[in-house]
């Protein structure tokens, strides 16, 4: 508070929740180890006269009493688990009940926005171009990946600071509009298309103005007798359908596509417009009737239908998305796996497939 020394609070780790899954440990062995850490943390707190919060015992009680899972995998809390743990922490520190307030949802919304931007700063996807072996590659006029992408990191720093102000305003229930006008402009990148650098080949790339549209491409196909080819969908019909990277047909006969317009990753100050799309052909004329955005997902390199929903890559995570109210828009979003490779986004988890053995496969 600016008047005294900061107060130190020591928290134990949470317990390991038994989710009853054959694919996950039940947590008994882990809880024996975690209990030792909890006891050691208590001893240090008592010796140093520091505040102490026993999340290990509290979470174990919550897990036993809850009729819904509070973690995604036994050790990482889901949104409901985070909410209940927050109540435990507040009660322990303030020594009174702190009921969840509707205003907290507004705070949570801006915190998640800040977190998303910060996550793309410290865990930037396509990191090989940012920090790795390709960061020093130079293109037109000696401009390198590092020159451009490190500047983008500094842009995100400012955007995160702007959202931090929004968090504090929301906590105080003050009106606040995020203003990113103070964010440095991006560095202009000169195209190397047409042989303007060693990584470009004019012979292979040709003339950008000469690329065929979907309809123009049909006229150049050789079709066997008795067969017909139609243009089902393209980005002229549906602007959302840019850079489709995987397609699949659901049990209702609808085509789904993962579209990746931000390839190779989101650029600061631009809209994150990657999507998982549904393209139904309701009158069965061989042409998509509309384009539905099921979910916005950054770097959607692969997906597969599962458990009434969809597993989809969103580097560095694999998400489970599900529509529970029938409007074809995902209202459930669960992070199932974390830490998949994202250093080179177009080589990351893709070609999702559920095997006949019940196992989930992908290539990287």
Language-model features, listed with the residues they occupy:
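Beta-propeller blade termini and top-face loops
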Residues: 1-22, 165, 172-364
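Active-site-proximal beta-strand/loop segments in catalytic clefts of secreted hydrolases
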Residues: 11-15, 55-58, 65, 80
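Substrate-gating cap/lid alpha-helix
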Residues: 16-55
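Extracytoplasmic/periplasmic, Sec-exported soluble proteins
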Residues: 29-36, 73-81, 239, 268, ...
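A structural signal for well-ordered alpha-helical segments within the folded catalytic domains
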Residues: 35, 39, 79-87, 242, ...
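Conserved catalytic region of serine esterases and O-acyltransferases that act on ester linkages
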Residues: 47, 69-209
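The feature captures the short pre-catalytic strand/loop hairpin that immediately precedes
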Residues: 61-72, 363
